[in-house]
Curated annotation (Swiss-Prot):
Cellular localisation: Nucleus
Quaternary data: Monomer. Homodimer only upon binding to a DNA. Efficient DNA binding requires dimerization with another bHLH protein. Interacts with TACC3. Interacts with HIF1A, EPAS1, NPAS1 and NPAS3; forms a heterodimer that binds core DNA sequence 5'-TACGTG-3' within the hypoxia response element (HRE) of target gene promoters. Forms a heterodimer with AHRR, as well as with other bHLH proteins. Interacts with NOCA7. Interacts with TACC3.
One Pfam family cited in the UniProt record for this chain: PAS
Residues recorded with modification N-acetylalanine: A2
Region Required for heterodimer formation with HIF1A, annotated ranges: 112-168
Name of this protein: Aryl hydrocarbon receptor nuclear translocator
Biased composition (Polar residues): 1-25, 465-480, 629-672, 741-758
A Gene Ontology biological process term: positive regulation of transcription by RNA polymerase II
Ranges of Low complexity composition bias in the record: 673-695
GO cellular component: cytoplasm; nuclear aryl hydrocarbon receptor complex; nucleus; transcription regulator complex
Domain bHLH positions: 89-142
């Protein structure tokens, strides 16, 4: 161990000793040797061997390291200085760039604020965020939508552009037009200008908008169409702040492309006819109640107030080239006004039609099957004067005229049977101020879709106003109403004047009024024939006179008639003239002894069935004229020969008689009062009598009106003859009905020749050709009489 310590180089020379000793078994000697070895290892990093032959090499290495560090430090400082300069220069360049960028952005935002109308209208200059927000809103408004959809579509996909245009114009109740800003020439106008201004499109095409507006509004229109800067120079009013400021550079921005235009002007209204079917209800009301500007003189144009709103656009649009023949082609890019014109209905305070617009004429009510009000529209206050609570729980029949109550009850019974179909009836409704208002009620039933039971009846009650209709007093005499049969088939449009013949068809017995036996010496040439209207709101009007219609003191002709009544009472139709068993119309359809059901007497469009009401005046005179033209020496049933009355068939007689029977004067029950017909006796039923077989309405001239006196059971007493006794009541009542030339021919039977067809010329004009004979092939639904063969 001493040798090892004294000579450490020996241990270093033997490389295998160290590891062996160190890795040997633990022991005292080995432990000590291991410690010495560790100590020798620690001393090895020393500079013991550097002292041998090296000298001052230690100090020289340190100097070299210091010099190299100084060089590196100086080089690093130079690099840092250059990088700092570069960074400083870069920062200066970035600041300059940012400053220039901010200046550019500020300039652009300022320009944007001048372009956007909402920004330029502000009194103070807004901040950049406000300018951007207003610019976005303005772009949305120019695009036409308020929401930012992803696909950019702002209209429904199931609508085409044309359908969308029509819907927009219909909803706006206006018309679209495009006008050139430079010349005012109309480039385009929609077809909806016709219902708005009563002018066709052709009057707008090729003209200028200056020609369509009022002369006093031309300067205002030119100002709105102008795009120059000095068009609106001056002072403007700021609506938000209420201050008046001078208009500077904003005028040019306000007049630029895309700026909005909104102005009111007076446009010329035309006189072209407008089809109400082609317009919706709102447009039709606007057309009827279009506001005017005072009274219109004859020959002067009529102007209405129109509100125009739109935008200034570039014309022609991008990608569209004008044709060569266009007058504005080759002038470069121009501007045009795309606007919608709408009527300002409420702008004229002196409009005479405003009361009609504000005053409702109808109200909706709901009833149960009995007719009791269960719901009433609030418009009933302005229509009939009643509050809704005053009508609820009451029957509508209580407010109906006594003469129309049965008609209204029958209509409610029929609408229940129709099950959903609309039934219209006219009656007189008592308003709150005790006035009778002509009211048309269109009713239908609502059925439960599950149980198929009728829940209630819905009625639309319309006040029918007619300025030419004069109020007429009603008959004070009591009336007897016929009962409507269970099989009656009423049409969908039934008025009181149309329902009366149907009720009289189903009446089995009528009151017997004494005194009507025969009218032989009846001078037709002294009685004026009155035309009778068949349609209109005057169905079922009562007579103007409530006294006896056939009193002897009214006319001296009645005394002459009454003197011959008893003398002609016993006259009947001889067997040589008309046999009791012979039928005039033997082609197939005869009259059975039993009354026909009501559905066999249905109405047709052109030739209704023969249901002569007792007041059928012109029918009786017509039969009298036919009776005079018949052959007195004929021994068989009287017929029409071509020499006597060419081309005049029996259906024409029946149709003409019924046409006159459907009179507005012959309302329900007007001629069923016994006191009103003291000189008439109704001795047969309305449809047929027992054992009726013949049609004895045509006799010789010697026994005029003989069918009225023949009351035998073997003959069919037609109701056509009853109309003869009704003629005197219409004499002298000219204020309500005018006599036409068609019926003046009938007043001169003595001068008419058998070959003169002009006796019924205008009467037959309602039925078509006068020379042709009508048969069942032309009227398949007429089963009353077959064609009469000559």
């Amino acid at each position: 161990m001493a040798a090892t310590t004294a000579n450490p180089e020996m241990t270093s020379d033997v490389p295998s000793l160290g590891p062996n000793i160190t890795s040997g078994n633990p022991g005292p000697a080995i432990q000590g040797g291991g410690t010495i070895v560790q100590r020798a290892v620690k001393r090895r990093p020393g500079l013991d061997f550097d002292d041998d032959g090296e000298g001052n090499s230690k100090f020289l290495r340190c100097d070299e390291d210091q010099m190299s560090n100084d060089k590196e430090r100086f080089a690093r400082s130079d690099d840092e200085q250059s990088s700092a300069d570069k960074e400083r220069l870069a920062r200066e360049n970035h600041s300059e760039i940012e400053r220039r960028r901010r200046n550019k952005m500020t300039a652009y935002i300022t320009e944007l604020s001048d372009i956007v109308p909402t920004c330029s209208a502000l009194a103070r200059k807004p901040d950049k965020l406000t300018i951007l927000r207003m610019a976005v809103s303005h772009m949305k408004s120019l695009r036409g939508t308020g929401n930012t959809s992803t696909d950019g579509s702002y209209k429904p996909s199931f609508l085409t552009d044309q359908e969308l245009k029509h819907l927009i114009l219909e909803a706006a109740d206006g018309f679209l037009f495009i006008v050139s800003c430079e010349t005012g020439r109309v480039v385009y106008v929609s077809d909806s200008v016709t219902p708005v201004l009563n002018q066709p499109q052709s009057e707008w095409f090729g003209s200028t908008l200056y020609d369509q507006v009022h002369p006093d509004d031309v300067d205002k229109l030119r100002e709105q169409l102008s795009t120059s800067e000095n068009a609106l120079t001056g002072r403007i009013l700021d609506l938000k702040t209420g201050t008046v400021k001078k208009e500077g550079q904003q005028s040019s921005m306000r007049m630029c492309m895309g700026s909005r235009r909104s102005f009111i002007c007076r446009m010329r209204c035309g006189n072209s006819s407008v089809d109400p079917v082609s317009m919706n209800r709102l447009s039709f009301v606007r057309n009827r109640c279009r506001n005017g500007l005072g009274s219109v003189k004859d020959g002067e144009p009529h102007f209405v107030v129109v509100h125009c709103t739109g935008y200034i656009k570039a014309w022609p649009p991008a990608g569209v080239s004008l044709p060569d023949d266009d007058p504005e082609a080759g002038q470069g890019s121009k501007f045009c006004l795309v606007a919608i014109g709408r009527l300002q209905v409420t702008s004229s305070p002196n409009c005479t039609d405003m009361s009609n617009v504000c005053q409702p004429t109808e109200f909706i009510s709901r009833h149960n099957i009995e007719g009791i009000f269960t719901f009433v529209d609030h418009r009933c206050v302005a229509t009939v004067g009643y509050q809704p609570q005053e009508l609820l729980g009451k029957n509508i029949v209580e407010f109906c005229h006594p003469e129309d109550q049965q008609l209204l009850r029958d209509s409610f019974q029929q609408v229940v049977k129709l099950k959903g179909q609309v039934l219209s009836v006219m009656f007189r409704f008592r308003s709150k101020n005790r006035e009778w208002l002509w009211t048309r009620t269109s009713s239908f039933t609502f059925q439960n879709p599950y149980s198929d039971e009728i829940e209630y009846i819905i009625c639309t009650n319309t006040n029918v106003k007619n300025s030419s209709q004069e109020p007429r007093p009603t008959l004070s005499n009591p009336i007897q109403r016929p009962q409507l049969g269970p099989t009656a088939n009423l049409p969908l449009e039934v008025g009181s004047g149309q329902l009366a013949p149907r009720q009289q068809q189903q009446q089995t017995e009528l009151d017997m009024v004494p005194g009507r036996d025969g009218l032989t010496n009846y001078n037709h040439s002294q009685i004026s024939v009155q035309p009778v209207a068949t349609t209109g709101p005057e169905h079922g009007k009562p007579l103007e006179k409530s006294d006896s219609l056939f009193a002897q003191d009214r006319d001296p002709r009645f005394s002459e008639m009454y003197s011959n009544i008893n003398a002609d009472q016993s006259k009947g139709i001889s067997s040589s003239t008309v046999p009791a068993t012979q039928q005039l119309f033997s082609q197939g359809n005869t009259f059975p002894p039993n009354p026909r059901p009501a559905e066999n007497f249905r109405n047709s469009g052109l030739a209704p069935p023969v249901t002569i009401v007792q007041a059928s005046a012109s029918a009786g005179e017509m039969l009298a004229q036919i009776s005079r033209h018949s052959n007195p020496t004929q021994g068989t049933a009287p017929t029409w020969t071509p020499s006597t009355r060419p081309g005049f068939s029996a259906q024409q007689v029946a149709s003409q008689a019924t046409t006159k029977s459907r009179s507005s004067q012959f309302g329900v029950g007007n001629f069923q009062s016994p006191s009103s017909f003291s000189s008439m006796s109704l001795s047969s039923t309305s449809t047929a009598s027992s054992g009726a077989a013949a049609y004895p309405s045509l006799t010789s001239r010697g026994s005029n009106f003989a069918p009225e006196t023949g009351q035998t059971a073997g003959q069919f007493q037609t109701r056509t003859a009853e109309g003869v006794g009704v003629w005197p009541q219409w004499q002298g009542q000219q204020p309500h009905h005018r006599s036409t030339s068609s019926e003046q021919h009938v007043q001169q039977p003595s001068t008419q020749q058998p070959n003169q067809p002009e006796v019924f010329q205008e009467m037959l004009s309602m039925l078509g050709d006068q020379s042709s004979s009508y048969n069942n092939e032309e009227f398949p639904d007429l089963t009353m009489f077959p064609s009469f063969s000559e």
